[in-house]
Amino acid sequence: MKFLEKFGFEKKDIDALKENSTSALIKELEAHKKLVSKNLEYLNDMGVTNLIEIFVHYHDMFLMDNSNFVEIFNKYDQKDLVSKLAKNVQIMEYL
């Protein structure tokens, strides 16, 4: 899970994620780290400032095919979406 460090995750964030997730999920994230990184990169490039919080709560979304992942977020005005995500990550459930 060291690959998450380039997105601002600290060791404590990664340790907490490991403690609160199944070993199967951790293996899945590791096995698909290129895909997960690509999806994290997309949100980072969009200007999302709370990547860690979003990832911790909705990590399963980051295993989604990148084109589908991008399509979900492209339905909305990016500035507006970034602002709303900063205020309330729970809107991820409705995207």
Q: Where do the language-model regions lie?
A:
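Long amphipathic alpha-helical repeat/alpha-solenoid cores
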Residues: M1-L95
